Amino acid sequence: MVLRNPEKKGIASTLDERSGEIFRRIVETYLESGEPLGSRNLSRLLPMSLSPASVRNVMSDLEDLGLIYSPHVSAGRLPTQTGLRFFVDAFMQVGNLSAEERTSIERQVRRADRDQPIDSLLAEASQMLSGMSRGAGLVITTKSDPVLKHVEFIRLAPTKALAVLVGDHDQVENRIIELPAGITSAQLTEAANFVNAHLAGQTIPELRSQLEKVKETVRGELDALSQDLVERGLAIWSGSEGDEKPARLIVRGRANLLEGLEGTEDIERLRMLFDDLEKKDSLIELLDLAESGPGVRIFIGSENKLFSLSGSSLIVAPYRDSDDRIVGAVGVIGPTRLNYSRIVPMVDYTAQLMSRLSR
C-alpha cells in the first residue's frame, strides 16, 4: 500500500531493541499530542527497565543520527523531519479499515447523484476525507473529454466568432475563433448544422484521431469557407496533442489546518500554500507525485517543495478510469503530526472507490 524506503530499513537494522523502542515512543507521543517526551517519562513508559540516565544516552545517539532533536534546553525530544520519514518507512504499522469505516466512506462519497456532473462526486470525496482525517481533503481531476452534443458559431465581429461546444453533461466550452474572410452568417449556420448532424456523439480526441476522414466528409458536403470554419473549430477545441492537463482542484476542510497555528507567519505560510496549489503547474506536479509509484505516497514537509514553507504533509493516491489510465488523485493535507497509520488506508480505499465509480 505504501512505498517503503530500503535505505531507512537499513538504518532500522542498526538500532537495537531499546533504541528502537525509545525512538518509537518519542514519535508516537509527538503524533498524539505534539509534545516533546523527556527521559524521566520515557523510562516509565518503556517495557524494559532503564534509568533516565540510560535513556538520555540512547537519546543522544538518536540525535547524532539526526532522528530526534531538543526544541530547547532541558526539554524532551521531538522527531526531526528525517525521523518522521524514518518512522513512516520502517516502523509504522498500517492497519485495515473496519467494515463500518468502509461503509461510511462509500455512503458519503455516493451521496452525489449519479446523474449529476462528476464534480459533485469529487466534492463529496474531498469533504469526506477532510471530515475523517481532520485535515484538508484534496481531489485532483484531469480534464475529461466531453462527448460532443451541440455546436454553435456566434459572430462577434466581421472576422471573429464565438465557437460554443456543449457536452453530454451540459458542460459548455467557449472559444474565440478567427473567421475565414468573407464568410456569411448563413455559412456559420451551415457549418454548425454539419457538425451537429455528422460529428455529435464523439469526443474531440476521437475526432482528432480521424481528422483526415472528417476533412474528406466536410469537403464533400460543404463549400470552401464552411469547410475552413469546421476545421478551425475542431483545431481550436482540440488544442495540441499533449495538452491533457489537470483541470480541477477541489479542497475541503482548509479551516482544519488553522487549528493549533500560532502567529501570523504560520497563517501566511498556509495561505501561500493554497495560493500555490491553485496554479496549473502545481496541479501537474501533484498529479505527477501521485503517479510516481504504486499505491499511496507520503510526502513530509520539505520533501515536496510545495509544502516546504508551510511545514505540511501530503498523503496522496491516484485513481483510474476503465482503461486503467490515471485520471486523478485523492489525498489529505495536514500538519506533519498526522495520524499516518489511520489516514493511509483511508486514502487508499477512497482511491479504489473513485476508480470503481469512474469506470
From Swiss-Prot:
It comes from the Bacteria. The keyword Ubl conjugation does not apply. Keywords: Repressor, Stress response, Transcription, Transcription regulation. Gene3D superfamilies: 3.30.450.40, Heat-inducible transcription repressor hrca homolog, domain 3, Winged helix-like DNA-binding domain superfamily/Winged helix DNA-binding domain. GO terms for biological process: negative regulation of DNA-templated transcription. GO terms for molecular function: DNA binding. InterPro entries: GAF-like_dom_sf (IPR029016), HrcA (IPR002571), HrcA_C (IPR021153), WH-like_DNA-bd_sf (IPR036388), WH_DNA-bd_sf (IPR036390), WHTH_transcript_rep_HrcA_IDD (IPR023120). Belongs to the HrcA family. Negative regulator of class I heat shock genes (grpE-dnaK-dnaJ and groELS operons). Prevents heat-shock induction of these operons. PANTHER family: HEAT-INDUCIBLE TRANSCRIPTION REPRESSOR HRCA. HAMAP family: HrcA. This is Heat-inducible transcription repressor HrcA. It comes from Sinorhizobium fredii (strain NBRC 101917 / NGR234). The lineage of its organism: Bacteria, Pseudomonadati, Pseudomonadota, Alphaproteobacteria, Hyphomicrobiales. The gene is hrcA.
